[in-house]
């Protein structure tokens, strides 16, 4: 709250949306680590080591290449056009309906995605802390989102650049602290710790079997495409980058962030190995759901300091992804649908505050709806379906950037809606259609290609 007060004094709508383009690039780079490593990552990655070893690092290697592509291809475009909402590019290139379609798909996917991630983290916090005080889940969610609204409603992205830095510090510190505590309990020096992790069977990084879902090429290529789309074509992630002073600083931020992110993931994976070693040495049964491994050990076996660090870390992870998502939703809706830029400052403030409150309420309602469903498979299915909306966004941007053809703008919404539906049915019956082949992350690429094909069909040369 103190950071919010300091950063939001005299903040206008320009500060809320762009940070007045004065953010220090190194703060943006460090803060993006926490925003990218959501609460789901914080809980899931260490436990998943027991199932897939370090194979996740292959995907992260693709992420790093994707970050570099965003830095050299997309950031120059956004700075050249001086964009606030990145979906304004679609208006310039195709027309108003294409523009609204791209932005609408972002709003749906980001709202559901942010709610899903916050729902999972709120569930852990509810069991670990709030249930002891008989605080109902809905109140936990209202207070959580309410706090985010309080510290972001005035300063927006200008505040988030600074709060994300603090949240990333808490998140990474929690992991490092847990590793140190485990290594001390096992009497391992620094060198022995590194040797123990690197020699453990769970530290295998590369998998070359083609029929394995962990195959290097599948993971690496998927990592590239998913990053280009879910970072480079995502208002949430790009809004932070566009607060840097100029293109050069934004690119510098992206390159430094990519290395920081890579190191952070190695820490999470290393923690996973240490958790399994600790459990094995102490005869602790591994939970049926590996997602429960880190919370179970942190809160039940490592002592109060680690338990507190874990709760701080997971809270930081939840807030760092949810606060920027809420601000991005407000920005996109205000600019892309309410045309906020054409009004005077007083009217802009009213529109911005109203939009911010609207999406705060929607976020709460979606999370409570997930809880009411009380069926994890249904909730996960809703999250996956929302993820299909990124395919048309990929197709629209790629076609707009690399083709000079002019589309019939009124047909673009139909193409954008059809591509995910076609993709869904192909994915559902892929094992029958393609001799047992099952789609994974590459489904995003297929979705984008179907969109591009559809756009080609409804387009003509200039």
Where are these predicted regions, by residue range?
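Membrane-embedded helix-loop-helix hairpins and adjacent transmembrane boundary segments
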Residues: 1-462
């Amino acid at each position: 709250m103190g950071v919010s007060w300091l950063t939001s004094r005299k903040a206008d709508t320009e500060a809320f949306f762009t940070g007045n383009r004065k953010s220090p690039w190194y703060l943006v780079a460090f803060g993006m680590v926490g925003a990218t490593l959501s609460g789901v990552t914080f809980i899931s990655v260490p436990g998943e080591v027991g199932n897939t070893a370090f194979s996740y690092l292959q995907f992260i290697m693709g992420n790093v290449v994707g970050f570099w592509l965003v830095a050299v291809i997309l950031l120059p475009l956004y700075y050249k056009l001086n964009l606030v909402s990145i979906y304004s590019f679609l208006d310039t290139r195709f027309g108003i309906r294409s523009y609204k379609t791209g932005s609408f798909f972002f709003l749906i996917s980001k709202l559901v995605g942010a709610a899903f991630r916050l729902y999972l983290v709120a569930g852990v916090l509810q069991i670990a802390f709030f249930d002891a005080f008989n605080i109902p889940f809905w109140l936990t969610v209202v207070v959580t989102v309410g706090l985010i609204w309080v510290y972001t409603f005035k300063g927006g992205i200008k505040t988030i650049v600074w709060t994300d830095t603090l949240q990333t510090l808490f998140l990474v510190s929690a992991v490092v602290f847990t590793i140190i505590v485990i290594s001390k309990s096992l009497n391992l020096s620094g060198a022995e710790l590194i040797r123990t992790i690197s020699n453990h069977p769970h530290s295998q990084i590369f998998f070359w079997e083609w029929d394995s879902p962990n195959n290097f090429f599948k993971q690496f290529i998927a990592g590239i495409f998913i990053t280009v789309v879910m970072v480079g074509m995502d208002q949430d992630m790009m809004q932070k980058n566009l607060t840097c002073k100029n293109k050069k600083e934004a690119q510098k931020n992206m390159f430094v962030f990519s290395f920081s992110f890579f190191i952070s993931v190695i820490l999470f994976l290393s923690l996973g190995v240490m958790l399994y070693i600790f459990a094995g040495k102490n005869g602790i049964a591994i939970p049926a759901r590996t997602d429960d491994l880190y919370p179970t050990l942190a809160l039940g076996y490592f002592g109060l300091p680690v338990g507190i660090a874990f709760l701080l870390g997971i809270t930081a992870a939840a807030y760092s992804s949810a606060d920027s998502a809420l601000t991005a939703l407000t920005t996109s809706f205000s600019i892309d649908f309410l045309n906020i830029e054409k009004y005077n400052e007083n009217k802009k403030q009213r529109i911005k505050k109203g939009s911010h409150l609207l999406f705060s309420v929607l976020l709460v309602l979606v999370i409570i709806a997930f809880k009411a469903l009380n069926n994890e498979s249904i909730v996960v299915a809703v999250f996956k379906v929302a993820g299909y909306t990124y395919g048309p966004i990929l197709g629209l941007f790629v076609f707009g950037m690399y083709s000079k053809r002019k589309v019939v703008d009124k047909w673009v919404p139909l193409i954008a809606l059809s591509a995910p539906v076609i993709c869904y049915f192909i994915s559902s019956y892929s094992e029958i259609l393609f001799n047992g082949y099952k789609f994974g992350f590459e489904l995003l690429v297929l979705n984008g290609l179907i969109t591009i094909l559809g756009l080609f069909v409804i387009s003509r040369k200039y």
